[in-house]
Amino acid sequence: MKVTQIKELVNSSLKEVNGTSEVLKEDLSNVVDIGKDLANNDDIDNFVKKLVDRVGKTVFNNRLYQGSAPSVLMDAWEFGSIVEKVDADLPNVEENDSWNLQDGKSYDQDIFYQPKVSAKFFNSKITFDIPMSFTKMQVKSAFNSATELNSFLSMLMTKVQNAATVNLDGLIMKTINNFTAQVVHANKGLQTINLLSLYNDTTGENLTSAKALTNPAFIKFANLTINSYRDRIAKMSTLFNAGGVNKFTPLANQHLVVLSDFASASKVYLEAETYNQDNVKISNYDSVPYWQGTGTKYGFNDISKIDVAIKDGATTTEVVQTGILGVLFDTNALGVSCQNPRTTTAVNARAEFYTNFNKYDAMYYNDLNENFIVFMVADKAK
């Protein structure tokens, strides 16, 4: 079983989402199976070398971070590694001979009709570790009570949990982004919907992507189109997956994720001035503030952009796309399975500290034979 270490990817992803880096190319080909600084002060503790001795009151930043990525977590298991997805083709229809009887004709009932069954296997994991060391004796001089010391240690553990949450959020988004990139790269008919081009062709307007989210008429058209495709993928079709497989996705199994700027624009420019809001809005969706990162300015071109390297047969291909407003997919199209968070502890008796190794591994997968649609706004090339 292939297990990929992703320390560098996880660390660079944090810079993309906290505004300290532009949106950079991410290689997902091995991830998704398809105040003031304290300086020059001698009165500091001997543990983290940052805490001032004998402070009257210390306030700890112990705020727990709540993740915002869409939930695509599947079940977990202890033994075995491979995920197997089994499917079968639709059987062909034959004539009903009960209503076509002829004198003296033989009707053969002993024909074997073999089911056309297919299976896909997913057998790769990613893994990372967040280590942090703790001590008590060496840092006691920085606090006035055991309560303060425990609050400090609690803050450190919360920081570890927050780091895990933000990085797992990023990995979930990478799972979605990898599928999005696969669809954009394949450029197959009804899997990639340029809402802006459709709107301009339908209305005769010449709207640009820069103005689209402030145009109520466009937003109404976009909501109409998205709702139409939700009805369409509920019916059996081969048009909405890369494998050309007969698939249908009932509303209960649909997962719609939209850019929060688009969702907010719909509420402000459209729903706020509409009496019958249910007739014009999209519903039952998750929203995300960006797909891959914020850039340094949180501009639309950054938050609506993906720049990833994906598997393309035996090679990798870079896919760059801006203007992505949303994705609609079957709940079986992608997910996170066999997740295994755990903590191991090592005690160093000589130096009197202990280290927690917070480990996580899981399977991140895309099934390109499931329904997946990308909605975007892209200006026509000049």
Q: Where are the regions a protein language model picked out?
A:
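A structural signal for well-ordered alpha-helices, especially hydrophobic packing surfaces
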Residues: D103-Y107, V160, R230
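Extended, compositionally biased alpha-helical segments that mediate assembly or anchoring
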Residues: M1-Y65, Q277-K382
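Extended oligomerization regions of viral-like shell subunits
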Residues: L207-G335
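Loop-centered beta-sheet repeat module
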Residues: K159, G170-L224
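Assembly/oligomerization interface modules of large self-assembling protein complexes
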Residues: V48-M132
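Alpha-helix boundary/N-cap detector
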Residues: M1-Q5, G35-K50, T147, S151, ...
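Mature, Sec-exported extracytoplasmic domains of Gram-positive
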Residues: V31-D43, N100, G104-S106, V183-N194, ...
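Long, contiguous amphipathic alpha-helices that act as assembly "spine/axial" helices in icosahedral shell
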Residues: S118-G189, E352-N358
